[in-house]
Each structure stands twice: as structure tokens, then as C-alpha cells.
Amino acid sequence: MKTVLAAAILFFSFFSTPAFSAAIEARIDLSRQEMKVYQYGRLKHVWKVSTARRGYKTPTGTWRPTRMYREYYSKKYYNSPMPHSIFFYGGYAIHGTGSIKSLGRPASHGCIRLHPGNARTLFNMVKRVGPRNAKVRIVR
């Protein structure tokens, strides 16, 4: 009986470890205009972001990255540069911005803007583990 109980505890503790969650998780809080980046369940970075300004929308939910580009230019907004883009839902992406003074308040057309250095760091973290092992979670 003790052997069965020990095996059951070991079995269930294995499935509750961070190995079964995303290796990299970017959690964006729209009300705080903040991103927290977790690596294997541990907080690694806290960064200011800019999300959708009035009249635009940043979606809420959880996704995996779908496409990644070191250099990308918006097809919708005047060929604007979007360095280190991580697309997660249609045309919505996390990317670097030249408008660093607006970080910490809503300013975008819906994407999540980061300081260019932070966008590069996140991009490289996701690239290292692969998009299938990363998660983007956006909450209000």
C-alpha cells in the first residue's frame, strides 16, 4: 500500500512541475501597462508597455506566438518599424518601439509596445525555447 501511495504522489507531483507549463510566459496587464516575463515559472523581468489607446483594442486572452521577425514593417500603419516582433493573434504583436516616452500608458493601435532593448531580450528568450514553448497572456 505504501508503495502505491508513494508512486501516486510521485506521479502527480511530476505533472504539477513547471516543465508542463510554458518555458517563457509574457503576462501583460492592461490596467498597469506592464509586462512580467516568467522563465520556467520564475519572474525574470518587469517592463513598462504601451497597449491600445482610446478607439483601439488590445485583445485579452492567452496565445502562443505564431510568427517572429527580427525586422518587420507594418503593412497597415505606414510601414512603421516593428523590431523584434512576436505575433500572437492575427496582426497583433509584441514589438519594440521608438516611442519610448509613451511606455507606461496606452498609445498603440492594439499591439504591445516595448522598449527596443526589452523587445530584443524577449525575442531572444522565445527564440531560444521555441514559440511552441512560449505563452502570451493579456489581462485587464
Predicted regions, residues:
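Exported/periplasmic cell-wall-interacting domains
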Residues: 21-23, 53-62, 69-140
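Bacterial N-terminal signal peptides
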Residues: 6-14
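A structural motif detector for short, solvent-exposed N-terminal "entry" segments of globular domains
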Residues: 20-54
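N-terminal signal peptide c-region/cleavage motif recognized by signal peptidases
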Residues: 16-18
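Positively charged n-region of N-terminal signal peptides that target proteins for export
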Residues: 1-4
